[in-house]
Amino acid sequence: MKKMFIRHALAVTSVVLFTSQPANACDVCALYSAVQNESPVENAFRLSLAEQFTALDRIKTDGRYTENTYNQFLKSSVTQVSGQYDVSNSTSLQLVMPVVSRTWRRIEDEKVQRGSDAGIGDITLLAHYVPVNYSNGNLLARLRMFGGVELPTGDAHYLGEESAPGHHGDEGDSHGGEEDSHGDSHEDRGHHSFTQKHNGTVHAPQSANAIHGHDITLGSGSWDFPLGAGLYAQWKGFIWQTDAQYTIRTEGAFDYTFANDWAWATAVGHYLYLEDDAQVALRARLSGQYKGYDTGSGGVRYDDTAFNGTFIGPELTALATNKWFGVLGYDLPIEVHNSDTQITPSWRIRAALTYRF
């Protein structure tokens, strides 16, 4: 019975991937889209709820930690509601709606500023295809491919901070204009502050703002295109899974363009409990993401936006009654490289629950 279950059961996977929600780079690429690696079952419908909470409170300048003198932080919660319909035994369609909530403390105009915002993010439509679904005795292997479009449904007004009028033409001449920024109008202060941040001209990292409009925006204002694939393999009680996603991004609100980004994850583990209608597995998961520099109007490069991070942590998955599937994971950063001054993550927690009708 167990061999039959292994052959036909729901693949114990991390409900991960990955959809891209504008935010801090570590938050952009590692979100859920509540995707399962189960083969589609014709006319089946799945409803999923997934949550990722990320705590960002470590400031890094060009990959090196600096003192967080003013206790800047960003707490980011992304809850994704997902519905998936299996058109056939190899193809399914999915809609993912993120609800984003962020709370932060940062430095603006030499003053401590606290803020928060919440709302619907950028909705994603995905199509999944399973070209390979191999099963032979104790061995199971499954290849999944997906692609889709991310719609500009989220509020992107915070990106206006990044596109203050006139800053494109003045960036090259603004070095050393730090003193002038304190005596100008509110708009000019915002302009000079932006220029200093994105050109690294603030010489006291401990007082530099590490949280910007691109970190806290709920949406991008752009039409983006996620593409990816996942491979799942199971032999007896051992599990291996790897996933990768690349997101192509276009120009969005305020002429702001988020950099294309890569996200990947690989996990290995073993069943702790395995029966016909229930299973529990423990896995070790290594994941990461990479994105380059965001750009503005005319291709101007924003120097505090590149990010390359690697995370590791445990993950527990469970299946009940062949209908309910859940996952709980915890990630710690083991390597983070960033450009200029940014707030970076100290930990994140992931949880998801899926029901198949």
Residue map of PLM features:
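Outer membrane beta-barrel transmembrane domains
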Residues: 58-62, 66-69, 253-357
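Short loop/turn motifs that connect adjacent beta-strands in outer-membrane beta-barrel proteins
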Residues: 36-44, 90, 132-142, 158, ...
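Transmembrane beta-barrel strands of outer-membrane/channel proteins
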Residues: 45-53, 95-99, 145-151, 233, ...
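Short glycine/proline- and aromatic-enriched beta-strand/turn motifs that initiate or cap beta-hairpins
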Residues: 25-74, 156, 205-207, 211
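Outer-membrane pore/translocation modules
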Residues: 102-259
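Residue-level signature of outer-membrane beta-barrel architecture
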Residues: 51, 85, 97, 129-131, ...
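Hydrophobic, lipid-facing positions within transmembrane beta-strands of outer-membrane proteins
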Residues: 45-47, 77-81, 121-125, 143, ...
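Transmembrane beta-barrel outer-membrane domains
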Residues: 40-42, 72-76, 115-122, 138-140, ...
